[in-house]
Amino acid sequence: AWSGNFDNDPIRRGKWIREHLLAGTIPDVPLDVDAVVPEHRQQSLRQRLQVTRDEYCWSCHQKMDPLGFPFEQFDDFGRFRKTEMVGDLLSIFPERHVDAETVALDTRGSVSDSGDEKLEGDVKNVVELVHKLGDSTRVRQSFVRHAFRYWLGRNETLDDSPTLIAADQAYVKQGGSMKAMIASLLSSDSFLYRKTN
């Protein structure tokens, strides 16, 4: 679920989507930034994360936060939910929360700066986001690239372009077949004639 031990983490979820599905990059947190979410437990997590809207932080957070917020529909254990508990949350078990109340979840988000115009725009919830990502050529190609890196044990080079194109075409021609993509990768020159330095 890509969350912390005791709370959701839409920032981490959004960063994962940006880097692994959209093939983007997010720089590390600068050393002079205290990257801690405020503990104002009377506010929702989205409200507490407003601190990331400061100009200094927002240049990176605008690429992550809107991608992670739709996943607020799931708690830190991955359980579906419609509301968020606020107040004194002393336990990870909702039935044991003391002086807690619930607020409606805001699962709106957006995709921006993705490099794929069809992917750009607002989403109401995680289902819309997943459908957008699933229909994206950029996400598919990023998926193929990650499969290449896994199966070949290295990053791709310019010489690997024919292998990546063939694997992508095999995946598409077989209706999204992982088996066809892996067969294409493992029968490619990039795999069969690897350098052993």
Where are these regions (language model features)?
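Active-site substrate-binding loop specific to GH73 endo-beta-N-acetylglucosaminidase modules
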Residues: A1-R138, V144-R149, S161-G176, I182-N197
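Core structural elements
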Residues: W151-N155
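Short, surface-exposed acidic
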Residues: L158
